[in-house]
Amino acid sequence: MAPARAGFCPLLLLLLLGLWVAEIPVSAKPKGMTSSQWFKIQHMQPSPQACNSAMKNINKHTKRCKDLNTFLHEPFSSVAATCQTPKIACKNGDKNCHQSHGAVSLTMCKLTSGKHPNCRYKEKRQNKSYVVACKPPQKKDSQQFHLVPVHLDRVL
């Protein structure tokens, strides 16, 4: 009976570790970074770049291949200005989202294959409106804006 129990404990520990790792969201903000700084890294790209190279900068922080990501080809100041449009409901029900005035150039990157750090993406360039969640800037953020984007809620 003892040998069966000895084999059970490592399996249980492995299962618990797997469940714990599965709970870490891919979009979790890296330590030492504000939500707005992480938003800039994940979604701001004034000049379009190929997804395979652009996503390396995101994936190096998360240590995994992010499934889907959208880059807005706008200056940060333009996206921050979106935070001044009327509030609308976010997908999660919060009321701190704001819709862009019009369509902007963007690139959607979708994971096709690979394991970190060799993630491969398919890209799709589009012109669409977007919705961002905004919050007051934190101490480490630029205080230039009353509200700053912290989450890309959806593309319309």
UniProtKB/Swiss-Prot annotation:
<feature type="active site" description="Proton donor">
    <location>
        <position position="151"/>
    </location>
</feature>
<dbReference type="InterPro" id="IPR001427">
    <property type="entry name" value="RNaseA"/>
</dbReference>
<keyword id="KW-1015">Disulfide bond</keyword>
<dbReference type="InterPro" id="IPR023412">
    <property type="entry name" value="RNaseA_domain"/>
</dbReference>
<dbReference type="InterPro" id="IPR023411">
    <property type="entry name" value="RNaseA_AS"/>
</dbReference>
<feature type="region of interest" description="Important for antibacterial activity">
    <location>
        <begin position="29"/>
        <end position="32"/>
    </location>
</feature>
<feature type="disulfide bond">
    <location>
        <begin position="65"/>
        <end position="119"/>
    </location>
</feature>
<comment type="similarity">
    <text>Belongs to the pancreatic ribonuclease family.</text>
</comment>
<keyword id="KW-0540">Nuclease</keyword>
<dbReference type="Pfam" id="PF00074">
    <property type="entry name" value="RnaseA"/>
</dbReference>
<dbReference type="GO" id="GO:0005737">
    <property type="term" value="C:cytoplasm"/>
</dbReference>
<feature type="disulfide bond">
    <location>
        <begin position="51"/>
        <end position="109"/>
    </location>
</feature>
<dbReference type="GO" id="GO:0019731">
    <property type="term" value="P:antibacterial humoral response"/>
</dbReference>
<dbReference type="GO" id="GO:0050832">
    <property type="term" value="P:defense response to fungus"/>
</dbReference>
<feature type="glycosylation site" description="N-linked (GlcNAc...) asparagine">
    <location>
        <position position="127"/>
    </location>
</feature>
<feature type="binding site">
    <location>
        <position position="69"/>
    </location>
    <ligand>
        <name>dUMP</name>
    </ligand>
</feature>
<dbReference type="GO" id="GO:0051715">
    <property type="term" value="P:cytolysis in another organism"/>
</dbReference>
<keyword id="KW-0732">Signal</keyword>
<dbReference type="GO" id="GO:0001530">
    <property type="term" value="F:lipopolysaccharide binding"/>
</dbReference>
<feature type="active site" description="Proton acceptor">
    <location>
        <position position="43"/>
    </location>
</feature>
<protein>
    <recommendedName>
        <fullName>Ribonuclease 7</fullName>
        <ecNumber>3.1.27.-</ecNumber>
    </recommendedName>
</protein>
<dbReference type="GO" id="GO:0005615">
    <property type="term" value="C:extracellular space"/>
</dbReference>
<keyword id="KW-0378">Hydrolase</keyword>
<feature type="binding site">
    <location>
        <position position="43"/>
    </location>
    <ligand>
        <name>dUMP</name>
    </ligand>
</feature>
<dbReference type="GO" id="GO:0050830">
    <property type="term" value="P:defense response to Gram-positive bacterium"/>
</dbReference>
<keyword id="KW-0044">Antibiotic</keyword>
<feature type="disulfide bond">
    <location>
        <begin position="90"/>
        <end position="97"/>
    </location>
</feature>
<dbReference type="InterPro" id="IPR036816">
    <property type="entry name" value="RNaseA-like_dom_sf"/>
</dbReference>
<dbReference type="GO" id="GO:0042834">
    <property type="term" value="F:peptidoglycan binding"/>
</dbReference>
<dbReference type="GO" id="GO:0005576">
    <property type="term" value="C:extracellular region"/>
</dbReference>
<comment type="function">
    <text>Exhibits a potent RNase activity. Has broad-spectrum antimicrobial activity against many pathogenic microorganisms including uropathogenic E.coli (UPEC), and remarkably potent activity (lethal dose of 90% &lt; 30 nM) against a vancomycin resistant Enterococcus faecium. Causes loss of bacterial membrane integrity. Probably contributes to urinary tract sterility. Bactericidal activity is independent of RNase activity.</text>
</comment>
<dbReference type="GO" id="GO:0045087">
    <property type="term" value="P:innate immune response"/>
</dbReference>
<dbReference type="GO" id="GO:0061844">
    <property type="term" value="P:antimicrobial humoral immune response mediated by antimicrobial peptide"/>
</dbReference>
<feature type="site" description="Critical for catalytic activity">
    <location>
        <position position="66"/>
    </location>
</feature>
<dbReference type="GO" id="GO:0003676">
    <property type="term" value="F:nucleic acid binding"/>
</dbReference>
<dbReference type="GO" id="GO:0050829">
    <property type="term" value="P:defense response to Gram-negative bacterium"/>
</dbReference>
<feature type="signal peptide">
    <location>
        <begin position="1"/>
        <end position="28"/>
    </location>
</feature>
<feature type="binding site">
    <location>
        <position position="154"/>
    </location>
    <ligand>
        <name>dUMP</name>
    </ligand>
</feature>
<dbReference type="GO" id="GO:0004540">
    <property type="term" value="F:RNA nuclease activity"/>
</dbReference>
<keyword id="KW-0964">Secreted</keyword>
<feature type="disulfide bond">
    <location>
        <begin position="83"/>
        <end position="134"/>
    </location>
</feature>
<feature type="binding site">
    <location>
        <position position="70"/>
    </location>
    <ligand>
        <name>dUMP</name>
    </ligand>
</feature>
